[in-house]
Amino acid sequence: MTGVYQMNNAAVVIETVRVLEQKGYRIDETALRKGLSEVYWPGRFERLHEQPTFLVDGSHNPDGIRALLESLRSYFPDRKIRFLLGILSTKDVSTMLRLIEPLAEEIGVIMPPSEKAMDNERMAQQISRECAVRTTAFASIEEGVRSMIENAEKEDVICATGSLYSIEEIRTCANREFHQNCGGCERL
C-alpha cells in the first residue's frame, strides 16, 4: 500500500479482523500480512514511471487532496510538484487549489471526461486569479500528459489528480508516451 493515508486503511482492516475474531471467525495472521503487503489500489498514489516520477491519484475533494499532499510531502520532501489537474465543476475547486498551491511548481489543466467537468480554460483563469503558480490549459488529456512528460526533467515529480473520471485515460496516455519516448525506460 503506497501513500501515507493507506496506513489508516490498513488500520481499519486490522481492526475489522480483530472484531471478526471476537465474533468467532478465524483469520490467519500470515494471510492478513500477505494481503496487506500485496494490496494494490489503482489510481491511488499509483506510480506509473520513474525519472521523471509520474503519479496518478484520484483525489477529487479537499480531504482526498489533503491526504495526497501528505503523501507527496512524505515521499518527496522539499520538492515542488508539477500537477496535472482536472476537476468536476461540482467540487470545492477553490479549497483544493488553496491546498495544492504551496506544493505546486506548475499546474496543467485538463478536462475530465464528464458532463460535470469544469471547463479547462475557466479553471486555468481561476487558478491564475487565486494562485501564484504557472498554469497551462490543455485541449485534451493526451496533450496535457504529453506536454508534462516532454517538459519534465529526470528529477521532476508529475502528479495527475482531481478526478476519478480521468485516471484510465491518463494512465493509457502516460504509458504510451513513456514507451514511445524511451522504450519503457524506468517504467514501473
Kindly give the residue locations of the regions a language model identified.
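Nucleotide phosphate-binding/pyrophosphate-handling subdomain across enzymes
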Residues: 1-106
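Short, flexible loop segments at boundaries between secondary-structure elements
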Residues: 113-116, 179-188
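Active-site-proximal loop/hinge segments that shape catalytic or ion-binding/gating pockets
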Residues: 163
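C-terminal helical cap/extension that packs against the catalytic core
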Residues: 53-54, 62, 97-157
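Active-site catalytic pocket residues across diverse enzymes, especially alpha/beta-hydrolases
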Residues: 20-21, 72, 127, 152, ...
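Short, active-site-adjacent cap segments at secondary-structure transitions
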Residues: 166-168
